């Protein structure tokens, strides 16, 4: 809009200028062109003013800047001044409103004496406005946030903003969740709270990731501590981790069941979408608190109060439901014991022990649950006693009303049963796998029917190192955008309130459906995360492998190759066996297990698989190095056996690629994404193994053959390189010759036996530019006086009909065929003073005359020579030409100012050669004078 408006203003100004200069009218095209010119002119002027402003440290231009800009554009200020004085000023025809309309500054600088100004950190300069103003924070507390994918979309209360740094620290400390936090308050809280926290670490992490979904609950976080139990319950869903960083990690662990409850409570899908990206929680302090709130509803009331105290955490959306809502929420966290009823009993038994004992408040069996409880206890002490009382009341109600919700527990336990069997497995990657399932369960319990976003996104946040947070957020957001619609349809039967425990059959269905839904999205997210982590690990491994390979190269290469072949086969078999075992399970389980067991369990399986992979890589590298070394040794042998080797080569490459293929297929999760890939890969495995077993000897032969081939190729390359070097040397020589203006270089070795016959050899060098004429000469004393070099002039090309050049050439020079011009032996001895001096000795001399064929001579496709006149750079057109007796360049007569052919006896030299002759004469005279 501004551009078109400004262009119309320029158009009016152009018309006014033309009118002021006396024009009555102007063509449209001319007006458009002038408008464009004026626009560019003003833009250039403005750009120059702006640059000079910046150069001198000003924000607004002054008159000096405009003057400098005019000078930069080549405008003489004096002339401009005269022009303005001599022409009447023309005012613009219209009033121009200021555009674009200036907007008020929205930056919320704190007022002096305000809370923000007092709390402002010293290292923050005064000119930096706060990211979020206190007013905005208050509004956020009052108004529920819209669904958004970004972490900032989740509104955070004022307190949270103040504690942003604290939240970040808390997020970082999620890894510290195992560390027990001992606080006197921990024992004060009823065991019911503990059970939620005590839920297996994986559950807590899942809750932390997923709870984000209900953004509406964010408002509840700000609810005053005195809230009624109903409000407390809502806030409990939000239950944010205590402001203390250590507390956050334990809450995340216990929150796995709670996220389900939270998801069930949130009425609006928008909130779910926000919370759905679990990665965001860990990434942004704001998001993290909400997942914590999503934690178990029982402990949530206390956590809610904590959230009130800790601004960073109070993000979990509060459930729109009335106090009854906790009934649905509590079942998953409150009664992990009940899951035993469900067919998932086996899985629940593992998790159930931890969850049930912790919830009962008896003795948490696993150390992980204890630290979680302790962490929560630390968080709880922060809450006011009044809040604690209300929370206790809410908890008591929830305990009375709630029946174990097998769905929620099962959702956590399904994936967790395997993952959480040992506290070690509770590694971040495992928790990520479990989190998606709880989210699905929450979707089922949700009466609102909001489409739950697959929780799989949550897995990413904890799995990857903190540096990967940004990339993880993007991945989670993308996953959340695509997946939310599917789960609700599958879980329609779960819409009924979770107050009454469903029958075990629905649990099985839910479990299968959850695994299916979660598997696709989770697998993708896991794959992305794992790929990132693996890439880093692979780089480190490669560096280690390089160092190892260097050390190993010192050892005997032959023994290494044998051992490597055997070990490589074994490793390949082992890896493929694992893949085949995974294939036996349904594809969804296969994906989950691969990523949870092989990739996500960094502590357990990563050590074995990575070690094997590293060994495999190291072996390959060592093999390659060994091959190179052997190639060097075998080069001599290869020459003899080159014929046999040519026939054998193809076999070796066929055997090796399968080995190389096996590693990437197993190591890279991307290959696993498509289940269709698995069947195609599985048939290949036995064949590869079979080849590896039966053909160890063939492999050795193939390796030798490959080495021989490589040696042959190297020999060929060496020959090519030698040829190229020779060519380069020739080119250099030619350049030097041109620099010396085609001087003759003569080497004169003494020949013991003089021979009256003068055999002559003419050799073509390079692209026909140099002729090496070797002749045996019996020098005669007459040669001394002949200082000028008499050399046959190479005649113009045969096709030229003009006889003139032939007349120009001296009589001794025959007209030879252009491809091989010859030099008459009689002319050679006097070629240079060196030869004449040698002639005085009467010793027979073999002279090698390097005759430079002018660069102005080119051979065409048929081998014919084409002469170019150096004067005009045009080819021989049949007009008369004259050749230089020294450099053999042929010139058109007009180019050198000749109108008639000179006498044949007279030698003709071009300007270059004539100057050389003069220089030589001057040098000789100087030497003689000495």
From Swiss-Prot:
Residues 428-446, 482-494 have a biased composition (Polar residues). Belongs to the TAF3 family. This is Transcription initiation factor TFIID subunit 3. Coiled coil: none annotated. It holds the Pfam family PHD. Transmembrane segments: none annotated. The keyword Protein biosynthesis does not apply. Keywords: Metal-binding, Nucleus, Transcription, Transcription regulation, Zinc, Zinc-finger. The keyword Zinc applies. It comes from Gallus gallus. A zinc finger (PHD-type) spans 866-916. Residues 274-291, 448-462, 674-686 have a biased composition (Low complexity). It is found in: Nucleus. Residues 793-820 have a biased composition (Pro residues). One of its GO terms (molecular function) is p53 binding.
